[in-house]
């Protein structure tokens, strides 16, 4: 079962360790089992994170966890499994940095006045995102093609979701 208090404190402790690797800490999950713990850490950066960066972050995090008394107290006297990964395509776009990393990508998002749309992220400035809306879903679930540019506050949209695009071959 996840322990949110322990995970929150571990996130606070690990954020500088991850930042020291040039990465952003995107999530920490601590799953308690009877005889062990499973710690999931999600990291990212602008331009995406590479496998060797994940490996370096994993080593730095492991070293920290093995040598920090507070982290040791949270995890407890049992063994733990450390899993460090990138967020993956299914991560919701919530923070401005998430939207910035999605510039040029197609996303599904819910707008306050239009409802669900599929749009291309064109730009992010501060807490605003400029979208090129390509498809809008109607109340009966039909998908209608439309093009409209719109700038909206990130706080006003429900979390966005990146849409997978496939290349069309002639």
Swiss-Prot record:
- Subcellular location, in the record's words? Cytoplasm
* Gene Ontology CC: cytosol
Its BP terms in the Gene Ontology are:
ribosomal small subunit assembly; translation
One Pfam assignment: RimP_N
Annotated disulfide bonds? none
Highest taxon above the source species? Bacteria
Kindly report the protein's main subcellular placement as a broad class.
cytoplasm
List UniProt keywords, sorted A-Z: Cytoplasm, Ribosome biogenesis
Question: Known Gene3D superfamilies for this protein?
Answer: RimP-like superfamily, N-terminal
Biological role stated in the UniProt entry:
Required for maturation of 30S ribosomal subunits.
Query: Which family does this protein fall into?
Result: Belongs to the RimP family.
The identity of this protein, by name, is: Ribosome maturation factor RimP
UniProt organism field? Acidothermus cellulolyticus (strain ATCC 43068 / DSM 8971 / 11B)
